[in-house]
Amino acid sequence: MNPNSPRSTYSIQFDSQVTNNGATGTNLIQASSDNELQLGNMQIKGLRFLSIPYPPNFWDGVIGLSFISQYPLKLDYDTKTLYVYERSSFIPPKNTIALKIEYALGVPLIPIQVKVNNRIFNMKVEIDTGSDRVLDMNTPFVRQNDLLGTQSPFAISRITSSDSNAGELQNVFFDEVRLGNMNFYKIPGAFSTVTEGVQASQEMDGVLGNNFLQRFNITLDLQNGYIYLEPNNLIYKPFYHFLIE
């Protein structure tokens, strides 16, 4: 929940603190236990709410893994609709890219293959629909594979994560990204130089952001450990308009 939102008129009793692992660092935030969320005609009880001070005009809150992990759901970018399914009625979608999920630092990871400078890497990356990035390689992965300095960055990005810390990314081009049975060529990605937070972690190789993920309608079945990706009408959307101008 975003306490800075002008629509935050709720009154919640925060009863503990938890560590928030952001992309560029960590911080302690307030937590409230045993809350209820109404979504459409569904009422979900026993949820923990967190207070994360995003900028006031961003959003009122973020639906996180504590909810998403309880129900199969679909993010349909074609219709801009979120579908939440009862487990008893959920049928995995057909004709999609089905990827097995693993976990690190409490977040879901998927396998992808990336070619950089004609070198092929099999990576496990976090799926982060809250990120506006494309694909960032974590700092330890970049260092271990001696990637920093192998390309002249076409831009430098300075990012701020939910913990309010900042970091720097060197934007470069990846020759190819393979996701399931689909290949994407000359993809703008980044080498991380961040020294704290998720993007400095050795527990995963990188982060796949929503600038890539939005090209698929996404079905998440976290209880059974699968993500299903279906190409949508954003599949050929430019990653960054300034690269084609």
Label every PLM stretch briefly:
Residues 1-245:
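Pepsin/retropepsin-fold aspartyl endopeptidases
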